[in-house]
Amino acid sequence: MRSFVFTGLLLTLFCVHASPSAPQTDAALWPANPTNQAWPVTQPLNPPEGLRPCCAFGYNLKAEALGVPVPFYQLGNVIDTQHLGEHHYNDSNLGAVTNLLGINSEKVGLIYTRRGGFIDLAHVRDTADNTFYLFSQILPQLGQRWRIDLQPELALRRIQFTEFTAPADPAERYALATYLAGKLAFQLAAWHEIAQWYGFQSVPGFSEGVSAFSPEDLYSNLLGAHLAIQTILTGHAQSVSEFNQAMTDLLPTALAQLDAVSVTETRVQFDLLDGNWWDSHKRVPEKFLVLKRNYDTSDDRLPTPVPDETLPPQRLGLPDNIDSYPLSALAALQLWPGSDRGTLPPSKMYFTAADFAMLALQARSADAQQILQKR
C-alpha cells in the first residue's frame, strides 16, 4: 500500500471560539441531535491507511498457510473493556504492523455484549476513522460537485458529490457534513464485506472469504460510525489528537451501555456457539471456519441475535435525511470494477449502495448451497 505524508493540523475556524463539550456518554449509542455549534475543524486529512488486522470469528484460532498448518500460532482474539488502550487514527501502515506484533497501545479484538452481540473493535475503530476522514474532506466543499477516489477493493471506490445549495448556517452545514460522512463510511464498510466475499485479497494469495459477512462485522462498523458522529458533533474534530482522545474516552462507555462482559464470559459465549456459528477445528483462512453470517447491509440494524440471550437488543441506525436534505442525493459511493474484479457479476458501469442487497443475496444463496454440499 502507498504510504501517505500526514498533513498538518492547522485549524480552520468556522464559528466562535468555544471549548468543546465532553462526548455525551449517556447518548453514545445514538448520534447526538444536530449541533447548534459549528466547531473548529482540522484541515482535510489523509485517508486511513488500510484496515486494522483483526478478527476472524472465534478465539484461540489456529492458522494455515498454503494449506499447511502454522505450528505454535494461536490468535487469542478476545478483549475486555479494561484493556482497550488508546485510539489512534490509522493513517500509517505502522499501525497495522504494531497491532500484529501486539505492541500498539491501541487494542483490537472481539468482545461479547448482551445488547449488541459480538463486537469487533477493529471494525468499530476503522469506520470511526473513515467517518472523521470523510467529514474533514466534505465540510470545506459541501455543496460543490467533486469526488474522492480511494484505493481499490475489487473496484475503484469513488465517492461522487453532487452540487447543491448547502445550508447558509454554519452549524447546519457542520451537522449535515457529519451525518453524510457517517453514512458514506458505513457504505464503505458494507462494500468491504461484499468485496471480501467476491474475492478481494489485501494480501495476494491470502483469501479473506472467512471474514466476509461475519455475524458481528457490520453492526460493529455501524457502532463506529455512531461514535465518530457523536465525537464530531460534540466538538472533538479539531485535531487528530483530540479525536483520538474523545474516541478513547467514549468507546468503553458505549460498550458498557451494550452490557459488555469479561474475557472469560466472551469465551464462554464462543464455546456455546462452537459448531453452529464457527468451527474451532478449522484454521484461518478456511472459509467455513465461520458457519454463521449476516448478509444484511442496511445501516438500520439489530445485532445478529445470539441464542438464549435474554436482554433486548440495541438497534442502531443512521438517518436518511437531515432537515430537508436527503443524504443519498448529496453523494453516492460508486464501485468501478477493473480487470481484477474477482467473481463480481457483470455490471452496467459501476455498482452503488443500491446494489448491495442483491450482491449479498447472491452470496447468501451460494454459501447455503456450499454448506449443504459439505453435510
Residue ranges and their predicted role:
Residues 193, 217, 223:
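Divalent metal-coordination and catalytic microenvironments
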Residues 7-14:
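Bacterial N-terminal signal peptides
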